[in-house]
């Protein structure tokens, strides 16, 4: 995996955001989706774990959270934060595409703010479809880098269909 200056700068920004308290409330965002104890969650493009840690607490010890990112430093930060907060149900995956997870093994996939950064969107969306359980859902959070209309345009070419929107969160199920 090659060094990416843009990703490194984003990592630094996220760390600073969390340390100086720029208004950002991942727990409130997570409450907008239906996550239950015991579920298996994939936080694809987890960054420093802003959503990973709260989700891991929600699914509890019977659940599991896979935190996937292409930046080793981001994953190291997730591991350190999890240890500090006593969260032991997070498994990190270093990858920029393939998850390595079994078919139909994930209840909920979080794709929060990272869709614009994914180079091969077709490959990644096929991979996410592969690992998602038949009754699971893909939750995409849109932001200033990619508007809702563009996400819907991309998703129209996939095997996912929009089932729900809550603020900036779009939830998709398998067709």
Predicted features and spans:
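Conserved class I S-adenosyl-L-methionine
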Residues: 38-47
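A short SAM/SAH-binding and catalytic strip from SAM-dependent methyltransferases
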Residues: 107-120
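Conserved alpha-helix/loop element of class I SAM-dependent methyltransferases that forms part
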Residues: 20-39
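Conserved SAM-binding strand-loop segment of SAM-dependent methyltransferases
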Residues: 86-97
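A short glycine-rich, Lys/Arg-flanked "PGG" loop and its adjoining helix->strand segment in the class I
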Residues: 122-137
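A short acidic, Gly/Pro-enriched loop at the edge of an enzyme's catalytic core
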Residues: 98-109
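Conserved SAM/SAH-binding beta-strand->alpha-helix loop
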Residues: 71
């Amino acid at each position: 995996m090659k060094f990416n200056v843009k990703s490194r700068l984003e990592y630094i920004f996220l760390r600073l955001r969390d340390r100086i308290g720029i208004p950002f409330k991942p727990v409130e965002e997570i409450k907008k989706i239906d996550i239950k104890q015991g579920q298996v969650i994939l936080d694809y493009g987890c960054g420093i774990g802003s959503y990973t840690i709260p989700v891991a607490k929600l699914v509890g010890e019977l659940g599991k959270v896979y935190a996937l990112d292409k930046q080793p430093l981001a994953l190291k930060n997730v591991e350190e934060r999890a240890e500090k907060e006593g969260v032991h149900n997070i498994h990190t995956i270093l990858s920029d595409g393939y998850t390595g997870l079994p078919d139909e093994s994930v209840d909920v996939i979080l794709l929060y703010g990272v869709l614009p950064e994914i180079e091969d969107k077709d490959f990644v969306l096929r991979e996410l479809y592969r690992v998602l359980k038949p009754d699971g859902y893909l939750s995409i959070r849109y932001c200033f880098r990619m508007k809702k209309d563009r996400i819907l345009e991309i998703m129209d070419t996939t095997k996912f269909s929009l089932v729900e929107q809550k603020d900036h969160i779009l939830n998709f199920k398998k067709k």
